Amino acid sequence: MKTLIKICGIKRLDDLECAIQNGADLIGFVFVKSSPRYIEPSSVTNLLQSVPEKIKTVAVMQHATQNDLDSILDAFKPTYIQTDANDFTSLDLPSNIKKIRVYREEEDFDISSIDDESLALLEGPISGSGQMVNKEFLKKACKRKRLLIAGGLSPENIQSILKEVKPYGVDVSSGVESSRGNKS
């Protein structure tokens, strides 16, 4: 089975085209204002013209509010909304938009807390920091659940991660940047 590939933090057309040419299945647009990968919802519309139908789009949020979600949905309709797992309890999401629930590696993290109905993404303690989750923990988690993994993934380590951890999917962002927020 092919590993799902998500390239996150797309802001420029060149980066989008490169991600598509290199096999991305999912394209992530970051709507977290404090992130160097932040993009205005209205700017995504122009980029979407270059996204083939087979490529799915992800609106990446953090501690999302309904107002945040509504402003994104006014600009475009992503395939997925990605935010912290607990955020979804306070969001009224249209039924045709899927969820990517974000879980972080923490001491009290329980793999059984991940539901099977939506995609789940497991990352390090701080989103977008490039910190890798403990590899042994990932191996155990990926045996039990279909997980996307994020944090510290790059062209230099991705093959060994895929071979050892065997995740359902990978989410790459800072590992393919020439400078913060700019893909290479």
What is each of the regions a protein language model found here?
Residues 1-184:
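Conserved N-terminal beta1-alpha1 strand-loop-helix module at the mouth
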